[in-house]
Swiss-Prot record:
Protein name: Gelation factor
Pfam families: CH, Filamin
CDD domains for the chain: CH_FLN-like_rpt2
Free-text comment about domains: The rod domain contains six 100-residue motifs that appear to have a cross-beta conformation.
Region listing for Disordered, in residue ranges: 832-857
Organism ancestry: Eukaryota, Amoebozoa, Evosea, Eumycetozoa, Dictyostelia
A biological-process GO annotation: cell motility
Length: 857
């Protein structure tokens, strides 16, 4: 036996061993004795130890004693409990425990060990012998000698043999090192690992100072393990059977469903875990430790939801967003379930192989939904047959983004629709999970117009003539039947017929398009107008192209081709005739008129639209002029033609003379002569000038004048003035009065030689002032009035400026007359005066009595 460590006694060994024994129980309440002598002082740890080893409760003890009395009370309760268990305590009381009497405390603990660990009383020696005999039988095969519980254990061989005997192979004797302490310590470690025997004493203590009670206490654990092994095995077998019956076996668990077979992106991949026990029986309860993980080939883990249905079925689901291979791991308590891990292919469309197509990528119209289709294809180029892919569509118009709607058809195809609001070039691009399709963006022409609503009008749409330019207008109309206000639509126009026709289209940028063409040959033609290969309204349109006018058959006639005069419009008419001699009935011919002469002339030609053309020109100088008429560059029959232009009569230089412009009588024709003089002041010697005579008489009377062209530059004028009075005579040339016009002419009653009487009278009045004195100066108002049926009368009132006033008058006719004379508004003495002229019985019944008045001053 090795020497005991310096200063260490059996008390120290027992203290450590018994402390370890007690702490092995106290640990279940997370309690611990630090020093056996002092830790039991308050009675709390001792009471807890007693409750644990006896499986009984000690009630109403002080759990936090502060004073000695409370500690003694607790320990009294502990001592009394030990006695109540039938144990006899000698020489120890509560005060001894409070006062830390170690030897007495060791005796107390040994009493507890005997009862609850070794199950024997202190006076009974047979259990000790029985324990020794049990050890001998256990280690007999190992050829080791054990005679006691002291020095037989010093070299560690007995302990090593005992350790291996409970489970052969765990402590091979051949592995002993010969170092007793090391071998003992290793055996204690194995006993702890394999049999859960607490290491309540040190290897040094067993080697150098083997305290019998300590060794017995420690070795008793081995016998307990051996005696309880059968029960433990039975319990373990029962527990195993229970586990096999009531819990799942990872190797038998069934995992099934599309989520472990294959799936599609963005669609829930579901599968189920069926709890199955060791015997292959399905379990109907939940709560087991299944775990699921899903990791893609790119190393990214996909969240997986696991739901315990509490009926033995667990529902798992995950949604992959990237098409690739995934590893699905299903474990039960960190053990792979049957067939786990699973290699699952999640299919989905690939941006490099998917494509978009349809009319919405080829063109569209404002206000009309434009549709196209997306077809998903996987990385192998195979058509995808399920929906759920994350396709997005971006539509950009000249004015900004346009909303696009995507419908997932569930079969790998997607219907896309967008509704343009403005015409012009649009860009449409399709993305898959943010990546553009390989086909890239598509440029789409969006039209303002709708082919079914757009239409044409204009002359060139109804009729045309060979070799004549013509045109018509395309009116673009939207799908809403409203006229378009913007251009840019690709209308196509063609005209087919016997001969090719070149067509030009001008976009007016206002929703209209001008179509111009010049057919070279006549015949029946067809107009085609299309928009994106669709015919517009009323198309095709048949049109007959008439023959062009023939310069050999066409002709001109009119006075302007015979001659003219300066400053006067000369006119003639062109008649368009086709090669068959048929007069054309519409316009548009290429006639051109040129005139050359002494002065420039700009002829004006008007297309009457009926096959005739009116030409008018006004020469400014006299002389010979050459008129040329061409049709498409060829001279018309009879041209060129020379015409003579005479000097024009001048209103400024022309004049009129004659008695009819001086004095006329109501009973005789009045005559005068117009003398035509040209602009150079030369008297004209021929006629034809458009002189006009206008004569207006009293009271709005209009008198007709007869003008006779003497064809020698003079024009005779005769008119009758039917009543007396003033007449206004005006002679004009082309609206302009001739020299000294207009002129006033007085018409008087003409005398009848058989019936008329004549009287001439004169008298003088001498004026006096208020004093009756004759005045010697004039200035008074002298008024003379004659009333009667005069056929002709002249009357003058004269202030002689010497205080006398003279009245002079003459009368023609028959009848009674009255003459009134006033000075300053008052009749002179005897006024009015009565007189008779001729024979009143012969008075002209058509002459009525009237008053004539004259005033001086």
């Amino acid at each position: 036996m090795a020497a005991a460590p310096s200063g260490k006694t059996w008390i120290d060994v027992q203290k450590k061993t018994f402390t370890g024994w007690a702490n092995n129980y106290l640990k279940e309440r997370i309690l611990k004795i630090e020093d056996l002598a002092t830790s039991l002082e308050d009675g709390v740890l001792l009471i807890n130890l007693l409750e644990i080893i006896s499986s009984k409760k000690i009630l109403k003890y002080n759990k936090a004693p502060k004073i000695r009395m409370q500690k003694i009370e607790n320990n009294n309760m502990a001592v009394n409990f030990i006695k109540s268990e039938g144990l006899k305590l000698v020489g120890i009381g509560a005060e001894d425990i409070v006062d830390s009497q170690l030897k007495l405390i060791l005796g107390l603990i040994w009493t507890l060990i005997l009862r609850y660990q070794i199950q024997m009383s202190e006076s009974d020696n047979s259990p000790k012998a029985a324990l020794l005999e049990w050890v001998r039988k256990q280690v007999a095969p190992y050829k080791v000698v054990v005679n006691n519980f002291t020095d037989s254990w010093c070299d560690g061989r007995v302990l090593s043999a005992l350790t291996d005997s409970l489970k052969p192979g765990v402590r091979e004797m051949s592995t002993l090192t010969g170092d007793a302490v090391q071998d003992i310590d290793r055996s204690m470690d194995i006993a702890l690992e394999e049999y859960e025997i607490p290491k309540i004493m040190d290897a040094n203590d067993m080697n150098s100072l083997p305290d019998e009670l300590s060794v017995i206490t420690y070795v008793s654990y081995f016998r307990d393990y051996a005696l309880n092994k059968e029960k433990r095995d039975a319990d373990a077998l029962a527990a195993l059977e229970k586990k096999r019956r009531e819990t799942s076996d990872a190797s038998k668990v069934e995992v099934y469903g599309p989520g472990v077979e294959g799936g599609f992106v963005n669609k829930s991949a579901d599968f189920h875990i069926k709890a199955v026990n060791y015997y292959g029986e399905p379990l109907a309860n939940g709560g087991e430790g299944f775990t699921v993980s899903v990791v893609g080939a790119d190393g990214v883990e996909v969240p997986c939801k696991l739901v315990d249905n509490k009926n033995g079925i667990y529902d798992a689901s995950y949604t992959a967003t990237v098409p690739q291979d995934y590893t699905v791991v299903v474990q039960l308590d960190d053990v792979h379930c049957k067939d786990s891990p699973y290699n699952v292919k999640i299919d989905g469309s690939d941006a490099q192989h998917s494509n978009a197509y349809g009319p919405g990528l080829e063109g569209g119209k404002v206000g009309v939904p434009a549709a196209f289709k997306i077809q998903g294809r996987n990385k192998d180029g195979e058509t995808v047959t399920q929906g759920g892919d994350d396709f997005t569509v971006k539509v950009q118009s000249p004015e900004g983004p346009v909303d696009a709607q995507i419908k997932d058809n569930g079969d790998g195809s997607y219907d896309v629709e967008y509704k343009p609001t403005k015409g012009g070039d649009h860009t449409v691009e399709v993305f898959l999970r943010g990546e553009p399709l390989a086909q890239g963006p598509t440029e789409v022409k969006i039209l303002n117009s709708d082919s079914q609503n757009s239409y044409c009008d204009g002359p060139g749409f109804e009729k045309a003539q060979a070799k004549r330019p013509t045109e018509f207008t395309i009116h673009s109309v939207g799908a809403d039947n409203k006229p378009c206000a913007a251009g840019g639509d690709p209308f196509q126009v063609s005209i087919s017929g016997p001969h090719p026709v070149n067509v030009g289209i001008t976009d007016n940028d206002d929703g209209t398009y001008t179509v111009a063409y010049t057919p070279e040959q006549p015949g029946d033609y067809e107009i085609q107008v299309t928009l994106n290969d669709e015919a517009i309204k009323d198309i095709p349109k048949s049109i007959h192209i008439k023959p062009a006018a023939d310069p050999e058959k066409s002709y001109a006639e009119g006075p302007g081709l015979d001659g003219g005069e300066c400053f006067q419009p000369s006119k003639f008419k062109i008649h368009a005739v086709d090669p068959d001699g048929v007069h054309r009935t519409d316009g548009g011919d290429g006639f051109v008129v040129t005139i050359e002469g002494p002065a420039p002339v700009d002829p004006v030609m008007v297309d009457n639209g009926d096959g005739t053309y009116d030409v008018e020109f006004e020469p400014k100088e006299a002389g010979d002029y050459v008129i040329n008429l061409t049709l498409d560059g060829d001279n018309v029959n009879g041209f060129p033609k020379t015409v003579t232009v005479k000097p024009a009569p001048s209103a400024e230089h022309s004049y009129a003379e004659g008695e009819g412009l001086v004095k006329v009588f109501d009973n005789a024709p009045a005559e005068f002569t117009i003398f035509a003089v040209d602009t150079k002041g030369v008297a004209r010697t021929d006629g034809g000038d458009p002189f006009e005579v206008a004569i207006n008489g009293p009271d709005g009377l209009v008198v007709d004048a007869k003008v006779t062209d003497n064809n020698d530059g003079t024009y005779g004028v005769v008119y009758d003035a039917p009543v007396e009075g003033n007449y206004n005579v005006n002679v004009t040339l082309r609206g302009n009065p001739i020299k000294n016009m207009p002129i006033d002419v007085k018409c008087i009653e003409g005398a009848n030689g058989e019936d008329s009487s004549f009287g001439s009278f004169t008298f003088t009045v001498a004026a006096k002032n208020k004093k009756g004195e004759v005045k010697t100066y004039g200035g008074d108002k002298f008024e003379v009035s004659i009333t009667g049926p005069a056929e002709e009368i002249t009357l003058d009132a004269i202030d002689n400026q010497d205080g006398t006033y003279t009245a002079a008058y003459s009368l023609v006719g028959n009848g009674r007359f009255s003459t009134g004379v006033k000075l300053n508004g008052k009749h002179i003495e005897g006024s009015p005066f009565k007189q008779v002229l001729g024979n009143p019985g012969k008075k002209n019944p058509e002459v009525k009595s009237f008053t004539t008045t004259r005033t001086a001053n």
